[in-house]
């Protein structure tokens, strides 16, 4: 083939200049990829445990071996000291708020006899709640470590049935949860105190600390619980995919191929890589049964660790939602005769935002638990579908054992055994909320001054009653 040469030389000024800076783009891309990719279990949970370690909720963090690159749990003396210091600072700050006339953010917005009781209840519940969260998160750290070890063991077994776990998905989920919780907390706290300062109200530093630490600790506890429920959900999805793939192979192949060696897994969407593993169906079911048993044990261990934290968070959230809904309804219905520096819009906005914040907390807990429970319920249907299709006596026996295991081992999350954490909790909370709101509204309408007035604070009233008795 002939190639024509250019008759006239090209003027260098007619061509555009192109700047190539590979040295700047590639390092940034590599750093970003390192930031959002993970190859190990501990590596994908590293951001969450760094946050819990800094805030004193755990005595360990995820360290990295510079020689091998492996991630592992590392306990330090500073972790124990840090946790004790956080608890001591929190107790001291809450004691100052009680000493400062039972100071709370809500008391600056609203003053009535019911709000005195509500403020006192919120202060006491916040003090007890955050203390319980710290103690139940800090003391039984061994349960958290045991749960992580179970996840590591089941991940090794999942690889034997052809599953390669995508830890980067968990890492990105943990980043998303932490960033969203952080943004919501910062926006709500900053907005609240900006409204107070704009109305020439100066809260004490103790109130700043208690208000911020209460929301921060609750947000971190919810983020950690969400990550663990996501780990449980992911592994249940993997087991279900393995069993579904086995059923699909039996549908597409002849019945004679059931007793032969066959491929256990082709592809598991975003949870695995393309892998080919030759195994007998009975072996696949046996290993899936063992993995399911480990998942149930890990979920039970996680529930033991989080159970009192969840009870505390849901109780605090319910109490705050009840009083916030009452304050907003009283104002919107025009029954309140409040004396406040704040406009009605600012008043309603603050209590509505606080109510929505704790509604988000309850929804995050319930939905994370509910997703894992729903995935576990699907396993039974898949096992019985395989049981109806198989003709092999050995495979049928394994499936019957798996069916018995599913009857006795079920995944559920409870709040100290008092109630289950699933979507039925929405109905329970809405019913209790309606009942308490009706009681508070009736109490206000039957009171002589509609429950409002200048009055003294809850602490002063208690002191006067004590002096009168003496």
Curated annotation (Swiss-Prot):
One of its GO terms (molecular function) is ligand-gated monoatomic ion channel activity. PANTHER family: GUSTATORY RECEPTOR 8A-RELATED (PTHR21143:SF104), INVERTEBRATE GUSTATORY RECEPTOR (PTHR21143). Residues 98-119, 197-204, 331-346, 445-470 are extracellular. The lineage of its organism: Eukaryota, Metazoa, Ecdysozoa, Arthropoda, Hexapoda. The chain crosses the membrane at residues 77-97, 120-140, 176-196, 205-225, 310-330, 347-367, 424-444. Glycans are attached at residues 454, 464, 467. It comes from the Eukaryota. Probable gustatory receptor which mediates acceptance or avoidance behavior, depending on its substrates. Atypical expression also suggests nongustatory roles in the nervous system and tissues involved in proprioception, hygroreception, and other sensory modalities. It is also possible that it has chemosensory roles in the detection of internal ligands. This is Putative gustatory receptor 28b. GO terms for biological process: chemosensory behavior; defense response to bacterium; feeding behavior; immune response; male courtship behavior; melanization defense response; monoatomic ion transmembrane transport; negative phototaxis. It is found in: Cell membrane. Keywords: Cell membrane, Glycoprotein, Membrane, Receptor, Transducer, Transmembrane, Transmembrane helix. It comes from Drosophila melanogaster (Fruit fly). GO terms for cellular component: axon; dendrite; membrane; neuronal cell body; plasma membrane. It is a multi-pass membrane protein. Belongs to the insect chemoreceptor superfamily. Gustatory receptor (GR) family. Gr66a subfamily. Residues 1-76, 141-175, 226-309, 368-423 are cytoplasmic. InterPro entries: 7TM_chemorcpt. Its main location: membrane. Isoforms A and E have taste neuron-specific expression restricted to the labial palps, the internal taste organs in the pharynx, and the legs. In addition to expression in a large number of taste neurons, isoform A is also expressed in a few nonchemosensory neurons, including the campaniform sensilla of the wing, leg stretch receptors, and multiple dendritic neurons in the abdomen. Isoform B is the only receptor not expressed in gustatory receptor neurons in the labellum.
């Amino acid at each position: 083939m002939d190639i024509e040469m250019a008759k006239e030389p090209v003027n260098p000024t007619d061509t555009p200049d192109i700047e190539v800076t590979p040295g700047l783009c590639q390092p940034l891309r590599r750093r970003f990829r390192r930031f959002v990719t993970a190859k190990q279990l501990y590596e994908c949970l590293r951001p969450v445990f760094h946050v819990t370690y800094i805030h004193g909720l755990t005595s360990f963090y995820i360290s990295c071996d510079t020689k091998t690159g492996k991630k592992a749990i590392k306990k330090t003396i500073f972790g124990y000291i840090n946790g004790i210091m956080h608890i001591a600072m929190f107790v001291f700050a809450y004691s100052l708020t009680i000493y400062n006339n039972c100071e709370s953010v809500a008391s600056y917005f609203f003053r009535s006899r019911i709000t005195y009781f509500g403020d006192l209840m919120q202060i006491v519940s916040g003090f007890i709640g955050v203390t319980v969260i710290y103690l139940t998160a800090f003391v039984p750290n061994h349960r958290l470590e045991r749960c992580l070890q179970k996840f590591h063991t089941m991940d090794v077994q999942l690889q034997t049935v052809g599953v390669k776990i995508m830890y980067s998905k968990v890492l990105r989920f943990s980043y998303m949860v932490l960033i969203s919780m952080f943004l919501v907390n910062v926006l709500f706290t900053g907005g609240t105190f900006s409204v107070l300062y704009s109305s020439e109200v100066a809260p004490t530093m103790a109130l700043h600390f208690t208000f911020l630490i209460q929301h921060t600790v609750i947000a971190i506890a919810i983020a950690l619980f969400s990550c663990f429920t996501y780990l449980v959900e992911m592994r249940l999805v993997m087991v279900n995919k393995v069993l579904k793939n086995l059923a699909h192979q039996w549908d597409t192949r002849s019945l004679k191929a059931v007793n032969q060696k066959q491929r256990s897994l082709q592809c598991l969407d975003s949870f695995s890589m393309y892998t080919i593993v030759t195994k007998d169906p009975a072996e696949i079911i046996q290993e899936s049964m063992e993995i399911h048993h480990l998942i149930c044990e890990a979920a039970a261990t996680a529930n033991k660790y989080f159970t009192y934290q969840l009870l505390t968070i849901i109780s605090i959230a319910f109490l705050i939602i009840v009083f916030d809904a009452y304050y907003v309804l009283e104002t919107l219905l025009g029954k309140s005769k409040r004396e406040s520096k704040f406009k009605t819009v600012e008043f309603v906005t603050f209590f509505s935002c606080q109510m929505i914040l704790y509604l988000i907390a309850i929804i995050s807990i319930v939905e994370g638990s509910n997703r894992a429970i729903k995935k576990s319920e699907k396993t039974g249907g898949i096992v019985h579908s395989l049981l109806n299709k198989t003709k092999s006596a050995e495979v049928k026996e394994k499936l019957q054992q798996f069916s018995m295991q599913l009857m006795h081992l079920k995944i559920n999350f409870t709040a100290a055994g008092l109630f289950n954490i699933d979507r039925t909790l929405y109905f329970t909370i809405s019913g209790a909320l309606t009942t308490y709101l009706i009681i508070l509204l009736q109490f206000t309408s039957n009171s002589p001054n509609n429950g409002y007035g200048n009055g003294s604070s809850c602490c002063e009233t208690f002191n006067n009653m004590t002096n009168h008795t003496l």
